[in-house]
């Protein structure tokens, strides 16, 4: 079965040389996937025969050669870098002979996303070029990888964009719908008739395609549609931990409404009621993949709130603030149904960045 991956390209050497984006650029221009964990510094710092080790490094043909060196001379033992090299040279190419079912991989460069497939000509090499070794520190490579620009974050599914925020240098994207949407985009932008596939129109798949920002916007546009609440733009600060922004009601501009939204792998998606007790206004909490707890102690005890939305109601009161303002949990399923309705009903105001994903949901 094919898989979809993503590549983080900043290596320790490239960061030290202040060449953070150069590894990604090198990958794109040279049609390779390149990783760090070269043996150069380990050989230099070794008390053993440096020339002997260097000769062995020059003869690396596959991962087993690389692994033999780091085991024999106790390089990188127990470190995660070795696993990244194994993924590159073994796991990533395991489907390369399966035409139209090859593994796909994403790369990010200067805010743009690139997509490639691993083909039958892709081979692992240990590149000893001096610039690669000394400046980029990215000698572990997979060759013959053709990168194609898909676009910026506005056209990239949330399950793809959020996968770049943390994790290993090279890792699978396991989020639901990630593989299928990658295959669909490859088919749309790169190779017509490459692979025909569909994604089930379900709330799980829909939210998997939304970025965290799209999810915030979706909840806001529901409130605008339902209650005509208006957001105060200056309250949407990235350093605000407890809410996304503040809204005002047209019925009473003195009353504030706060929302908090958690979606995707980019952040911790659990919410804690204790964080909202001091807010002086109504609070609406939405978490797609997480749970809501009274506090962090309750999470340690695995005592999440049991929230039941009767008749698929949009929200449910779960607590109050210190000033007796209501705190609500928002029903993701009901919000998804609203988004589906907005896709068909053009009288409902909704940004295209959200609606576009229904084109791929069948």
Region annotations inferred by a language model:
Residues 2-101, 106-241, 246-362:
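Mixed-charge (Asp/Glu-Lys/Arg
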